[in-house]
Amino acid sequence: MTFRATVLTLYPEMFPGPLDISLAGRARSAGTWSLETVQIRDFATDKHRSVDDTPAGGGAGMVMRADVLARAIDHASPEEDARPRLLMSPRGKPLTQSFVRELATGPGAVIVCGRFEGVDQRVIEARCLLEVSVGDYILSGGEPAAIVLLDAVVRLLPGVMGNESSGAEESFESGLLEHPQYTRPQTFEGREIPEVLTSGNHRKIAEWRSAEAEQLTRERRPDLWLGYHRAKGGT
């Protein structure tokens, strides 16, 4: 089954962008996933092709209009479309590895890229848009966030990664950050590869990696560490 991605945007020229190279690019060429863009402005009805207006109640910036966006969504995703409808938004649900994995098992996604000060709340509710955030910062628009989401999803599609075990060993899959990685040369500017990693003792290697992952997570992501600790039965 091909994972079908449809992106609604004011800047379709931003796609596929980096999604056309490396793993994602090869997977798209192989038909593992497909990408369609929809120009939101094509669904404006006035001579200026307006897609935004001033915010109700006053304030800075402009807001994307519900009527224009609804027509674009209805065109891209009719009622029988089983794909989730996502709106890239800084106030959305955090994009996590578990959510990415959930999306990767589905038929695809319809992704709306917001611009300006935001999107009229009425179309978010009327078209059941799930708001998704890639982090606690503001971008110029939802397009870079959509690229991040799609890159994360595509690499988990069947056959995309050469080593199927790679995805299971990465950061977040176990609830922890990934352990440090090393490769040749054995010595770099006086720094050695940890001896345990060249010992050939797989049990000790696994123990070292687990301990390092726990330490890194505890130091750098106390939020993840708390969730991991609770899941392991801690208090």
UniProtKB/Swiss-Prot annotation:
Sorted alphabetically, the Gene Ontology BP terms of this entry are:
tRNA N1-guanine methylation
Q: How does it assemble?
A: Homodimer.
A GO CC annotation given for this chain: cytosol
Which keywords does the record carry?
Answer: Cytoplasm, Methyltransferase, S-adenosyl-L-methionine, Transferase, tRNA processing
Function field: Specifically methylates guanosine-37 in various tRNAs.
Q: Name the family the entry cites.
A: Belongs to the RNA methyltransferase TrmD family.
**Can you say what this protein is called?**
tRNA (guanine-N(1)-)-methyltransferase
Please provide an example of a Pfam family that matches this protein in its UniProt record: tRNA_m1G_MT
> What organism does the record attribute this protein to?
Chelativorans sp. (strain BNC1)
The catalytic activity of this protein is classed by the Enzyme Commission as 2.1.1.228
